[in-house]
Curated annotation (Swiss-Prot):
The keyword Transcription does not apply. The gene is apt. Belongs to the purine/pyrimidine phosphoribosyltransferase family. This is Adenine phosphoribosyltransferase. Its EC number is 2.4.2.7.
Amino acid sequence: MDLKSLIRDVPDFPKPGIIFRDMSPLLQNAEALSFVSHNLLKHVDLTHVDYFAGIESRGFILAAHMAATHKKGFLPIRKAGKLPPPTRKVSYALEYGTAEIELPPGRGNVVIVDDVLATGGTLQAAIDLCLLAGYSVESVAVLVNLTFLNKMTYNDQKVASLVQY
């Protein structure tokens, strides 16, 4: 399936010089969304996975759909202050400052899911957060990997993705 044809390029958003990869058209296509849920993690033995952890906000959509498809739980990785206590928090650097994400503590094996991997800062923070909160990270996956911006791996494997730029 040609997923790139369902991802809209939005030039100069959110600021000049950036090309935003809008996955809204893909999400509106039930066949494409199902394809993503069934094919993004072909390399992972999901029998050992308890949860799909989605990074706010578009990662929520993908992870929740994948969790339902594979009959697993869903964990929200949220911006700080959005979840009731208790939570664990991790701060990380952004191009223009810092950010903080949080997750309820717990146990189990997770796959972390997000929409786009750019520099890897948010995804690495999510990995660190899951480990801090008591979870074991089985794999990480993104719909779109901007490979020209990163060479990120996890456990000596490339981050799973279905679309690369």
